[in-house]
Amino acid sequence: MSEIEPSLLLSHARTIARDNDISCWALPTGELLVPHAAGGSTFIFVDQLEEPVLHLHTSPRGGVDLSEISELAYLANEWNHDCISPVVVVDYDQPDCVSVSGHSYLPADTSPSREQLAAFLLPALRNAEVLMDLLAQSHPGLVREASPELAPLADAPLEPFTLDSLAGLLPLIGIQ
């Protein structure tokens, strides 16, 4: 890739995911969403505030009680693999207020080649899947079943896309 274009970078990321049998959805805003079998999802986007950076943000669907924070902190500190850094997240406004999210990023100011992008993306997505599996085993409340409200959405006619509609859909797929 010679020039940095977020849409091109994300298009290559989506192609790499699909070529490796990883389910990857393009959102109307251009970002990508990778669902995980154990629950949760990885949101892929390009941040261009300063230098362009490809971000992967992985989060489970649910949360657990504050009493489990020390176990989750231990898990996040012990399980810190290549390409993903889990952190404990506390949202005091929610009844199940403790969750874990994972972050991976690739500085893209040097226009990574497809091979470099694949070398970053594939391990990051594999580790995100492993993290979701681990959370499902150790803290099942973090990876709840998808909301039953998603089923009618699958067959619903497409409505005009707005930021408000995206904000309403993201919690249904596990992004807080």
Model-derived features with residue positions:
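Long, continuous compositionally biased terminal/linker segments
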Residues: 38-70
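Well-ordered alpha/beta subsegment
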Residues: 94-122, 133-143
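Short, highly charged C-terminal tails/helix-capping segments
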Residues: 136-176
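Ordered, soluble secondary-structure elements with a strong preference for glycine-centered loop motifs
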Residues: 3, 7, 66, 111-118
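Helix-rich interaction surfaces within compact, conserved domain-sized segments
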Residues: 125-129
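Charge-rich, low-complexity N-terminal segments
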Residues: 1-47
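Short, ordered beta-strand-loop transition motifs
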Residues: 25-29, 48-50, 90-98
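Short, internal acidic amphipathic alpha-helical interface segments
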Residues: 58-99, 103
